[in-house]
Amino acid sequence: MGSVLGLCSMASWIPCLCGSAPCLLCRCCPSGNNSTVTRLIYALFLLVGVCVACVMLIPGMEEQLNKIPGFCENEKGMVPCNILVGYKAVYRLCFGLAMFYLLLSLLMIKVKSSSDPRAAIHNGFWFFKFAAAIAIIIGAFFIPEGTFTTVWFYVGMAGAFCFILIQLVLLIDFAHSWNESWVEKMEEGNSRCWYAALLSATALNYLLSLVAVVLFFVYYTHPASCAENKAFISVNMLLCLGASIMSILPKIQESQPRSGLLQSSVITVYTMYLTWSAMTNEPETECNPSLLNIIGYNTTSTVSKEGQSVQWWHTQGIIGLILFLLCVFYSSIRTSNNSQVNKLTLTSDESTLIEDGGARNDGSLEDGDDVHRAVDNERDGVTYSYSFFHFMLFLASLYIMMTLTNWYRYEPSREMKSQWTAVWVKISSSWIGIVLYVWTLVAPLVLTNRDFD
């Protein structure tokens, strides 16, 4: 009897696996908009992939992966498999994830509303989609080595570069939303308290940036041969200073009332992080001491028979993972009305979460119904671009691949280490990021015939 009841209970989940409403998550969470719940499920699936990739770097997993026929062929005697297997496994796992999201991105081009038949694939059929993703990942492990790793390294680097820029756009959006929220509360009442909070947050960001610059000059510019680091630190410091001054100019304030030092302080902190991340990827080890070595601890490395040391877990990599998680989940629940950012991310100006309280009662939720459901709030039009969202997750998969492997590239010269290419990718992304932020400030002054409200 118990078995029959158990089967009936399991059968009740079948509509969730195949239907259009992502009720797998809704059963655990309050009722919400379909547009938000769907994005959260895709983000959670990517998070599971990240966790599996991290497990694949654990030494205990390497022996199991080594049992795959031909997985380490032609590498014997050049780079030990106990180093290379984890590296290749992460590449193949992220390749599968990236292809899954890229296929969905192509499939969802120009979906305008949930009435489009393709929207049902986006918002439902979870079992079949995830089964397909797992099949793609498994198939990726049987791709012949050849030039796959080298080619995918450069593809991953380009994708990670684009995702860093998306991170910056979302960071600008977050800073604007943060500033607007606190300014509104300051105007509503208790202005001194909220003004102090706003000032404290801004001062803290600039203080962290100043401390970072000092530490960079102390630990990353010696010996004298580390001239590139001196240039990177100095240039980015001056660029951040210029952007901060520009954000409070009278003309900028007149055309962009939302601009201020809080946003520029957030951008400054992120730019300092990118500068640090770039310097830790320099091939010359004397110019890029790890954070743990700086504070007096030894980092864990994998040492090959040739005495080569490959350190898989860097502090900047861990911070990169944290930023990645915050970025992906923020993009899944963001409610910004910033029109400039919404145009860049192809998102509707309408809020996707605030509508929960005022969602139309069209039968999706019945009075007295205790079942948690997702309300279809996209019948008249989608609140975000399905295609762009999946493309962002495609880029996120590449960013994770590069972060987990510390931007290492396998070299036939029996070495696995970072390249100057990785350094310039990160530094150039920091420069482009500052240019993008400055453009959000000056665009209303340059393009006077356009509405930037």
Curated annotation (Swiss-Prot):
Main location as per UniProt: endoplasmic reticulum
N-myristoyl glycine lipid modification positions: 2
Lumenal side, ranges: 61-88, 145-151, 219-231, 281-309, 409-426
Pfam families assigned to the protein according to its UniProt record, in alphabetical order: Serinc
Modified-residue entries (Phosphoserine), positions: 351, 364
Compartments where found: Endoplasmic reticulum membrane
Quaternary organization: Interacts with SPTLC1.
Name of this protein: Serine incorporator 1
Organism: Bos taurus (Bovine)
